[in-house]
Each structure stands twice: as structure tokens, then as C-alpha cells.
Amino acid sequence: MCLHSYCAHLFIYIDRKTAEKARIWRYILFGLANQQNMINFVSRNELERMKMTKTEQYAQLIPQIKALIEKQTNVVGALCNVTALLKEAFDYYFWVGFYIVKDQSLQLGPFQGSVACYTIAKGKGVCGTSWDSQKTIIVDDVEQFEGHIACSSLSRSEIVVPIFKGNEVVAVIDVDSKDLASFDEHDAKGLETIAQLVAPLF
């Protein structure tokens, strides 16, 4: 191959490589632009949430939960939707679900989150203790709770709220967080209100 022909092929190769790089950069920049738009959209939603207190967030959910469960005969579906709504609303919720009293133990019900324990005995763990004491329990650090049942190693703090039918506990709402001390009296009040709303389903 003569020098002229070699140079011509070299220029064509360089031009092709340049065009390919330009095409790749266009994809990258276009993708980043779309990603930035998505980030901006998420940020706006997060800012709206940040403006609200926990009490306001729970208050906003109450009418939505009422609408979801009103005259609903599909109990499992209704409880699934309640857990989905709660997990979507609060970013510090790692796991949220129901444990239902059956055969003298708490049986796993509808939930959102990672794989969970199937059965919890009365008086055992945070859920079993809440059932036994008939009280809401807030645990800032689950590792410091005697007899804690570690369904997930990612769980750091927890709140459990009993659901009553008359004077009897028929289920509990269990919520876990990956962070320490995520729950307070505002969560307790909000979840206790929700427990009253869903009680007729049991």
C-alpha cells in the first residue's frame, strides 16, 4: 500500500472513531439530561414532603386509607394496599406489615419489605411483647431490646402498634427502619389511628 493510500485509510479510521465518540457522548449527555430532569422531579417531591411534619403526613394518609378499605371485602388486598401506601409515604420505613393473631401466635400477614418471620409467639420479640402488653412499643435500637427477633439484620429501630377488636388484640402493625431512633410519639399516634381504621377488617 502506498503512503497516500495508507494516509487516506488512516484518516477514514480516525473520522469514524471521532464520529463514534461523538455519538457516544451524545448518548451520555442526553442520558444525563434526562437523569437530571428525573432528579429534579424527585427533589421537588421530596421538598414537598420535607415541608410537612410527621403528624401532617399521617393526617394526609387517613382519608386515603379510609377510601381504600371502605366496604372492602377483599381483606388481604385491602391490607396490602395499606402497607403499600405507608411504605410509599415514609422514606424511613424499611419494612411495614401486619402480624395477625391466629392459633395462639402472631402469623405473618400482608407486608411491604424484605422476607419476614412467619410466626411470633406471644411475649416474644417486639411484636409478641406488644401483643402481650396490649401497648404500643417504640424501640430506638433493636439490639438493645431483650429477646428481639432479628428477621432482618438491616433493621435498626422498630415500632409495633396493637390492633384491637373490643378489648382483645387481633393483630399488630409492625414497622422497621434501617436507622436508629426513627420512630417517636407522632408515629405512634398516627399508626394507632390507622390501627383503629383497619380493625373492622379483622
Spans of features found by a protein language model:
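Short hydrophobic/aromatic beta-strand element in the GNAT-like acyltransferase core
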Residues: 95, 160, 172
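Sensory-domain boundary capping and coupling elements
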Residues: 164-177
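Regulatory loop-to-helix N-cap segments in sensory/regulatory domains
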Residues: 176-194, 201-202
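Short, positively charged and aromatic/hydrophobic N-terminal segments
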Residues: 12-13, 23, 27, 34, ...
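Regulatory sensory and allosteric helical modules in signal-transduction proteins
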Residues: 101-153
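Intrinsically disordered, low-complexity terminal regulatory regions
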Residues: 43-110, 198, 202
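A short, aliphatic-rich beta-strand micro-motif
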Residues: 157-164
